[in-house]
Amino acid sequence: MENLMASSNLIKQLQERGLVAQVTDEEALAERLAQGPIALYCGFDPTADSLHLGHLVPLLCLKRFQQAGHKPVALVGGATGLIGDPSFKAAERKLNTEDTVQEWVDKIRKQVAPFLDFDCGDNSAIAANNYDWFGSMNVLTFLRDIGKHFSVNQMINKEAVKQRLNRDDQGISFTEFSYNLLQGYDFACLNKLHGVALQIGGSDQWGNITSGIDLTRRLHQNQVFGLTVPLITKADGTKFGKTEGGAVWLDPKKTSPYKFYQFWINTADADVYRFLKFFTFMDIAEINALEEEDKNSGKAPRAQYVLAEQVTRLVHGEEGLEAAKRITESLFNGNLSDLSEADFEQLAQDGVPMIEMEKGADLLQALVDSELQPSRGQARKTVASNAVTINGEKQADPEYVFSDSDRLFGRYTLLRRGKKNYCLVCWK
């Protein structure tokens, strides 16, 4: 594990991991980092009630800087979340109510907290909310003190909004157009409040970050820096962090630890070593050694298991990881005796297909309702051919009717057809 990375070459180490997309004045920043600890920030807008995988790389980057002795500021956008960032978005965002945004702010702040250390002396993390400075600011102050420093000519040339300005069907509202000023002022404000000298963010944030750098120079005559992390792509060109069911969330109530773990297990060989560099704190030498070992082992690579274990532990803790592994193991070997009621709740949430049934239903009905079989006739043949298990036990009687002993924790019955097709019956 890398502990305190030497600060002066921290940028180099991030580059070796493929974690730097763009950086302003790299030499001056490296020099500034070599002089001693700095404060840096990353902003998270509450656009939903949870962060998702796309937020993980910048969040872990804050952690990497903190491990190297720097002071991270996690900014939750209580104000910017009310406006909506138009950067590279094809259409105007729906405005959310103040109550909703406030609720999301609280959830996201709680989600960010475990990744950073808020009690470690000089470089303890700080949680900030931009509603604190924008909430009471009036429009004249905004236009005179902030707006005066922004050139519309430059703003309309920013890549992030260009596509919206050039389309007749999807223009951009004044609300979203002014987002750039808000994020710019955040940087200037945090520079004044906490001496923040660096902003990090996803590569789509470059335009907002450079605006903040200019504004900080104009308002406070301070030189500050920006660094963006790349947008994560997969080798096959498909979007990272999405499954058939949508985004992969960090909130266990939205994506269960089991589903989260499985997401990483299913990483392609072409991506897995790169992802170990992005999403874990393993030493690069260790990752390269693992790649070498996988290449020469003649067996299935071990890297996916290492990745799944590391990231699940980071996000869901030891307990979440243990549950995910326990469920994975039980489904693989068909022995459900180790599963807890909470494990079944994870499976019902998003782990395997799930149906609800009234008590008194028979096995054939369950196979048809669960779409494990197209018809009762086909189900009858499948059961008779010994291809169906109930809670891991073979059941070859086509006339079988479920009994209370089949209902684990009084509620759950796991059906399997063949090797891999599962359905969880939840009894009403």
From Swiss-Prot:
GO CC, alphabetical: cytosol
Pfam family, one: tRNA-synt_1b
One Gene Ontology biological process: tyrosyl-tRNA aminoacylation
Catalytic activity: tRNA(Tyr) + L-tyrosine + ATP = L-tyrosyl-tRNA(Tyr) + AMP + diphosphate + H(+)
Primary residence: cytoplasm
NCBIfam families (UniProt xref): tyrS
Stated name of the protein: Tyrosine--tRNA ligase
Protein species of origin: Klebsiella pneumoniae subsp. pneumoniae (strain ATCC 700721 / MGH 78578)
Higher taxonomy: Bacteria, Pseudomonadati, Pseudomonadota, Gammaproteobacteria, Enterobacterales
